[in-house]
Amino acid sequence: MVKVYTPRRLREKNRWLRSDGKPNFKDRLYSREPELSPLIRRDVPPINTLTTVLRTCELMSSQNTRLIAVTSGKGNIIGVITAMDIVDYLGGGSRHGLVSVSGFETIHEVLNLNVGKIMSENPIYVNINTPLHKVLELMINYGLGAVPVSSEDDIYAGVLTELEIMKYLSVKYVGIPVHKVMTREVLSVNSSTSLEEAMWMMISLGVRRLPVIDHNELKGMLTWKNIIDLIGTHKIYEILRYGLLREFKSLRVSDIMTTDVDIISPDADLSEVASAILRAATSSLLVVEEGVVVGIITERDVIYGLVVS
């Protein structure tokens, strides 16, 4: 019997909400609540509907961001494109149907598509004057890892990410161990899993990262960034012999995974997680006990652990 998983983003939402559908924020969030302006990333440029998927991947890779706003000619936010939208389009989900309908066979054709055809329209975004607790409430309710921010006159101003929020909220000692907030159900692949299957798992199960485990031994980690970097750095053109989409989807996880995986103990303090994530420039850590992967902890887990009762 096949187990049907609830996408992680939905489990996370339910985990941190009260019965009335609102998060129960700790007093420390209100006492330290800042203006959004110092927290937003202004270095992530917007794109327009005619920007190609390739150019979008280049920006995501170079700017280390998984969300880019799509703006109108006047600078208003009209859509967003995320790394997972691109993974979906490349073979992970419903957006891939556009490839079949268009008859694309080469990776060049696939990556030359305008993002306007796969972006999310009418996106959730916040005004620069929105209180942080309201932003967090939105992020929790909708499972968002980043949101575009508009200026007072509704012009794109930047992006607010979980990483920037975590940086602000981090303190020297929290007193909450990793095992209290980590996700225990770790979905994994093996090193011979095809990229097509791994992308399908990411989209259908609502995860952005998959540990790679062979015979109970941790071999690496496959993340959205591995896929985006493969394209954004143009390495994809070096490893595909004929430049065909089917070659790309047939790649093995081991061809692009990260082998140097950052780990942490289940008894470590949340503050140690924040420090390790910032130091390693990653978005998650695997939780390992006596050589066995027992969980995973992300920027989102740290934030919620810090501010939600």
Identify the function of each model-found stretch:
Residues 1-309:
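Tandem CBS (Cystathionine beta-synthase) repeat/Bateman regulatory domains
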